[in-house]
């Protein structure tokens, strides 16, 4: 976690170092095994609380698979419909205009940070409360779904 935080601090806001898919997959793999190890060694921990700590990458991946399956596309094919990309395009369309990625990219991180940080915090708070952690997973997934569906409509309404 300290290494990831260090990477974020050194790399923000200009993104001079690219983590890439290999780095992201490695971090996800390690964090997933940490979660499994915790569940094996501390049976009082709710699996839903562990899922909350990894909520955004898991939920974003599941949403991408669902979206591509509904469109009869390859689930492994890339697209630009992830919530962070929609947020960045919304900032460009509504406030900053095109060719301003040096502003909208770090600003997207700031805008999304509270939403990305909230599920892990709730997961820590509900670490031993299985029902509450499960309800929190449902609530955050519903929030993500609503944000995903309504963000383009809001962006169109506030277009400059």
What are these regions (language model features)?
Residues 1-160:
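Alpha-helical transmembrane segments
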